[in-house]
């Protein structure tokens, strides 16, 4: 086992604070509408340019191991805030730095670290309750667009695109961000349920100009098995031959069964198309059941004793329209029962709560979106690849922020909400004087985001902070236009969830750092190669002497 380097008390805390400051100082320059960019060197390709706090934090590793421990603990604050709300990482870092700095000053002055932490925790619990009281719902197009604009670094186009996407696919719909091919940002909305499976034969195509298949009011047959012989295929075909079009979604359709479908289509006897079921294994079974719920059909599966030969028209589902191309199938306006669809969505949401892997959670959320609304894709446009990556990261942040705003509402932005909360809990007291100091540490930290926004805008932080504190309600300072006024009326909003998460995670990690008394790390390894080289050199000299003797 490697030897360890151990530091105690003030020596440990000073080193830790130095690491905290290096990381926080790099991150906090990005805060606010006039925050600056940070350029990150990459081992290959062009440097990355970002204004995203967590991206900057993740890049930082310090040479001194004790300092690095401090930096890594604050990095955890940014990562946790990002995971919980998708934004507010810089705010969380600024709050953590302030709590750690003021807290360690109090520890150095002889305060009890555990009571300080209890005081900080007490203040944060009270602050979170006050934040909930200040929060207002965010549901209309304008408010959603404003939240998106603020989070995307005052880019109004991005804010409007996100609001438009939410309006079209609903708040539960999936909105993804992709790199576009042009200079302009675009919004592409897929209504209905779409999955990544195309037609099994190009002979089904009935729209040669677009290379796609369009079926109006088709019946839909779902089969959890491979279909390969005519005997299985004929009953459903005969059922719909006179009634209309047919879409078959099965594990696979091959051999003579596929040939029969192609011949019937080409002769115009029945308009039919076949696609493979989406997903694999258990996920395929679940997605077939989703489609069944959406279209009012029954999945023909031998596991539940249903056979294709005995399929009747009652087992088939129905949709207003189906569009199939070589890569995707889109089912529009299925006739499934509304309450059954809602029940299915509730069931999948429960699975999301219980899911342990991010991949499973993401796939389940996609299924909810396909059942509940649709899918929107925001295609980000830019002139260069470097700009594209930076802009895409900003749009993703803005999307997370708007989702958080819809979930828990919004508060006045620009650090004003935390200033108002600090004012409301200023009379809070602890069980002893040390806890009171902890409460004051937390209250002072709540001013730090506003102060940093003002510093980044090149103004005097103390003057503006005092002016904002003297005001009431949503009165604050717009660093972008350099004006005072009602922040909500000026469209400067922060999602309540983002502000809450930033405060809670900052206090949690900072509280642990305040109560640190000892730090342990591996001793740096001595350069043993120099020693071995020296030894070899000595032997060489000896051998030379022996040669002389001979």
Curated annotation (Swiss-Prot):
Predominant location: cytoplasm
Gene Ontology CC terms: cytoplasm
UniProt: ATP binding residues: 30-33, 51, 87-91, 414, 494
Catalytic activity: ATP + H2O + a folded polypeptide = ADP + phosphate + an unfolded polypeptide
Biological processes per GO annotation: protein refolding
Family per record: Belongs to the chaperonin (HSP60) family.
Record text on subunit structure and interactions: Forms a cylinder of 14 subunits composed of two heptameric rings stacked back-to-back. Interacts with the co-chaperonin GroES.
Full protein name: Chaperonin GroEL
Organism taxonomic ancestry: Bacteria, Pseudomonadati, Pseudomonadota, Gammaproteobacteria, Enterobacterales
Protein encoded by which gene: groEL
């Amino acid at each position: 086992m490697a030897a360890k380097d151990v530091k105690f008390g003030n020596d440990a805390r000073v080193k830790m604070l130095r690491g905290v400051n290096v990381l926080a100082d790099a991150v906090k320059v990005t805060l606010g509408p006039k925050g600056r960019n940070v350029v990150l060197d990459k081992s290959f390709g062009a440097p990355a340019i970002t204004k995203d706090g967590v991206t900057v934090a993740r890049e930082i590793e310090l040479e001194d191991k004790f300092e690095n421990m401090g930096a890594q603990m604050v990095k955890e604050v940014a990562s946790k805030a990002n995971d919980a709300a998708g934004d507010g990482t810089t705010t969380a870092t600024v709050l953590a730095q302030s709590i750690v700095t003021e807290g360690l000053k109090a520890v150095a002055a002889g305060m009890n670290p555990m009571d300080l932490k209890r005081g900080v925790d007490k203040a944060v619990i009270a602050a979170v309750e006050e934040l909930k009281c200040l929060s207002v719902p965010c549901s209309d197009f304008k408010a959603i667009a404003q939240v998106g604009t603020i989070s995307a670094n005052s880019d109004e186009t991005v804010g409007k695109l996100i609001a438009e996407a939410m309006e079209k696919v609903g708040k539960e719909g999936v909105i993804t961000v992709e790199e576009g091919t042009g200079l302009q940002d675009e919004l592409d909305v897929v209504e209905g349920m779409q999955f990544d499976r195309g037609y099994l034969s190009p002979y089904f195509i009935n729209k040669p100009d677009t290379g796609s298949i369009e079926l109006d009011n088709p019946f839909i047959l779902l089969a959890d098995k491979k279909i390969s012989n005519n005997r299985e295929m004929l009953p459903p075909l005969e059922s719909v031959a006179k009634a209309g079009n047919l879409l078959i979604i099965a594990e696979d359709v091959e051999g003579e069964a596929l040939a029969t479908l192609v011949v019937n289509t080409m002769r115009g006897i029945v308009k039919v198309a076949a696609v493979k079921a989406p997903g694999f294994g258990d996920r395929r079974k679940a997605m077939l059941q989703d489609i069944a719920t959406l279209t009012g059909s029954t999945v023909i599966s031998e596991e539940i004793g249903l056979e294709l030969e005995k399929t009747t028209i009652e087992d088939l589902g129905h949709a207003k329209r189906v569009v199939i191309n070589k890569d995707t199938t889109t089912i529009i306006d299925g006739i499934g029962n509304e309450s059954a669809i809602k029940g299915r969505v509730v069931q999948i949401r429960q699975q999301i709560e219980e899911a342990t892997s991010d991949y499973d959670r993401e796939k389940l959320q996609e299924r909810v979106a396909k059942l509940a609304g649709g899918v929107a894709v925001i295609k980000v446009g830019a002139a260069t690849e470097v700009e594209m990556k930076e802009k895409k990261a900003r749009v993703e942040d803005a999307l997370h922020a708007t989702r958080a705003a819809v979930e828990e509402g919004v508060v006045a932005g620009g650090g004003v909400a935390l200033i108002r909360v600090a004012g409301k809990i200023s009379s809070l007291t602890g069980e002893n004087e040390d806890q009171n100091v902890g409460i004051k540490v937390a209250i002072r930290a709540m001013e730090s985001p506003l102060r940093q926004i003002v510093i980044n805008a090149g103004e005097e932080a103390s003057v503006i902070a005092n002016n904002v504190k003297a005001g009431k309600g949503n009165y604050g300072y717009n660093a972008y236009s350099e004006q005072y006024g009602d922040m909500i009326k000026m469209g400067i909003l922060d999602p309540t969830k983002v502000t809450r998460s930033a405060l809670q995670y900052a206090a949690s990690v900072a509280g642990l750092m305040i109560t640190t008394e000892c730090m342990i790390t591996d001793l740096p390894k001595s350069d043993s190669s120099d020693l071995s080289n020296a030894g070899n050199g000595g032997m060489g000299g000896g051998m030379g002497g022996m040669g002389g003797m001979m």
